[in-house]
Each structure stands twice: as C-alpha cells, then as structure tokens.
Amino acid sequence: MNGYAAAVRRLYDIYRPIARKYGLRMSSHTSIYDDGWIKIYKGEGADRQQIIKIEEANDTDLYDRARGAVISWENSKKERNARR
C-alpha cells in the first residue's frame, strides 16, 4: 500500500467508529490543481455544525492531519463530558 492509501485507511479506521458514536458527517475535496480539504460536521441539515476543517496541498498530509484532528476532537469531547 502506498503512502496515500495508507493515510486514507488510517483516517477511516479512526473516523468511522467516532462518526457512528457522535453522528458525524465528512465532506472532502482533493485536486491536482488546488489544495485539498476535509470538513467534518456534527449533525445534519440546517442544524449541523462544522467541527473540523483541514486544508493541505499534499493529499497524504491532508488525511494524516485530519486523523490527528479527529482524535483530538474526540479526546476534548471526552474531557468535557468527564467534567460534567
């Protein structure tokens, strides 16, 4: 598996269970002409909130940064819930 495919796999391995647990949706765009982006939302429709936005020129770096952002978001969510 090349670096790009491995980065995508690592992101989805982390993202899928977290998305199911918190009701997340992901939108992404990659292109050879401009920077790629990944946006992750909580909720659906008019009530959805963007919780993560990553932009990166290199697609492999994009997926790696998104993976780190998802992990960080879940950890902060767990900390907030633990304080309640």
Language model region names:
Residues M1-A6, I71-R84:
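Short intrinsically disordered terminal tails
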Residues M1-R25:
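Negatively charged, low-complexity tracts enriched in Asp/Glu with abundant Ser/Thr
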Residues N2-Y4, R16, G43, Y63-A66, ...:
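Short, intrinsically disordered, low-complexity terminal segments
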Residues I14, M26, W73-K77:
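Hydrophobic alpha-helical elements and their junctions with loops/disorder across both membrane
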Residues R20-G68, S72:
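Acidic, low-complexity, intrinsically disordered interaction modules
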